Amino acid sequence: TSFIVTKDTVDLARCRTLGVGHAEDLPKTKGVRAGKKEEKMGWRASDTRELILEDAIVPKENVLGTIGEGFVNFLKTLDAGRIGIAAVSLGIAEGAYEEALRYASVRKQFGQAIASFQGVSFQLADMATEIQAGTHLLYHAAWLKQNGRPFKQEAAMAKLMASDVANKAA
């Protein structure tokens, strides 16, 4: 069974044993330890490690959710996380767009700003359009989640589009 424990989502007073945020916060519970820090392509500020349980005994009062449903709950956290990744990606895309727009407005070629050239202005328009479309996908996925509706597909679509837009814009 897999599960996720974070300080943001766990009542640490209720779940003293598994309130894991960082390896150094790991309580001295027999059979519970943090693995190596994972090397990630992005979002390096988030410390991601495996939680190793070797013959660990979790007291009943520290069990969260239904025993045997940990993997299902884990997958649900990934769905919600996709909304956050989409939001971060769109922020990156917007920052890149604003910088590109600023640069295209001040960079002169042939006596005029390069923003006035069709090739550059089309690229800027495409960036703005894709950012706006990604934002709508993100808001829709977030609205579905907030209103208790299924959002798995929409969250995945928002993350895909937003991360693609961020890569193109950068």
Q: Can you say where each PLM-predicted feature lies in the sequence?
A:
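FAD-binding core of flavoproteins
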Residues: 1-102, 112
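Amphipathic alpha-helix face/heptad-repeat signature
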Residues: 86-93, 120-123, 127-130, 158-161
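C-terminal helix-coil-helix/basic helical segment that borders enzyme active sites and/or dimer interfaces
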Residues: 101-115, 128-161
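Short, intrinsically disordered, charge-balanced linker/junction segments flanking boundaries
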Residues: 162-170
